[in-house]
Amino acid sequence: MKFSFVYGLTGFLAATSSALPSEILSTGYERSALEKRGDGYLIMCKNCDPNTGSCDWKQNWNTCVGIGANVHWMVTGGSTDGKQGCATIWEGSGCVGRSTTMCCPANTCCNINTGFYIRSYRRVE
């Protein structure tokens, strides 16, 4: 069962993988823009409740962390304009190589459900 899931997700990553704009990957640029705007932050959750938005711990911006099964993420705080929070998910042992981007509407729980790594960011148009 696990092998089939990983194989399917690998195919999904291969099909949706795309290069990110260099400014998104630049930690200093993105962090300074986020600080100036102050329009939300990404939350990494276990047992995320979509009704209350409750969650176990907050993930810092532009930080590479390993995540396990049934880990959820959401965007909360000052994001009442309907903008999405996005996370980049890498396949492998760190935030390098092939990746895909997943986005989640503000204050909504979105299930990643993978054993891959994540590095969070918020798009700054």
From Swiss-Prot:
UniProtKB keywords: Cleavage on pair of basic residues, Disulfide bond, Secreted, Signal, Toxin
pH-dependent activity: Stable over a wide pH range.
Activity over temperature: Thermostable.
Covalent S-S links between cysteines: 45-55, 48-109, 64-95, 86-103, 104-110
Cleaved propeptide residues: 20-37
InterPro entries: G_crystallin-like (IPR011024), Yeast-kill-tox (IPR015290), Yeast_kill_tox_sf (IPR038651)
Signal peptide as annotated in the record: 1-19
Sample GO molecular function, one term: toxin activity
GO terms under cellular component: extracellular region
Superkingdom of origin organism: Eukaryota
Compartmental location: Secreted
Assembly mode: Monomer.
Function, as annotated: This toxin kills sensitive strains of yeast. It inhibits beta-1,3-glucan synthesis.
Full protein name: Killer toxin HM-1
Protein source organism: Cyberlindnera mrakii (Yeast)
UniProt gene name: HMK
